[in-house]
Amino acid sequence: WGGAMGAEIFSSAGVSAQVIGAPAAPTSAQDTQLAVKALDATHIDLLLFVGGDGTARDVLAAVDEFTYTCVLGLPAGVKMHSGVFAISPTAAADVVAGLAQGSLVGRILREVRDYVPAVPGASISKHQTVATKRYGELWVPEAAGYLQQMKVGGKEDEDLVVQEVVSYFLDNPEIYSGKALV
């Protein structure tokens, strides 16, 4: 993708790259989603993105769930609760090198989660319990030791737990097909 979303990095490193689109300035969530859709349509093997949970949500919103696109996040946000991030940029580079050499072939679904503010629009204070919400799952390379584990906040919010259980059953109807849920 053009500009600050990839092309500038390749250019500064002296690496040629095919640029299939360009972001607005400054970049936005919409630019991320447009880039993901365009790249996904080319049937890429791996989509690397840089950011935090908000960017992971943008990727999730744009990736075609039926293409099984494999993604890997490079942690660059202020909070990463999702399980789709490498533990470091070096770990991400090792995963990419392994994929290029054919040594890593498995993939696994990992959750995309994000902070849920107690008050809409509020930021996290150091005295506040952090609650997160599950937004879905993305395919990531199965690379034990290279991926961050999903982080879970301390205190459960019963309404969020109920919402997540209901969402899980709605997303996986084969689990209860032909059975009564009480």
Feature map (PLM): residue ranges:
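A glycine-rich beta-strand to alpha-helix segment
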Residues: A35-A38, I44-A61
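Proline-centered loop/turn at the N-terminus of a beta-strand
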Residues: L46, T69-C70, A180
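Gly/Ser/Thr-rich loops at beta-strand to alpha-helix junctions
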Residues: G2-A7, F49-R57, V78-K79, A180-V182
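Short Gly/Thr/Asp-enriched flexible loops that form oxyanion-binding sites at enzyme active sites
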Residues: I9-S11, G54-T69
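Residues on a specific face of well-ordered alpha-helices
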Residues: R57, T90-D94
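Short helix-terminating capping/connector loops at secondary-structure junctions
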Residues: T67, E174-S177
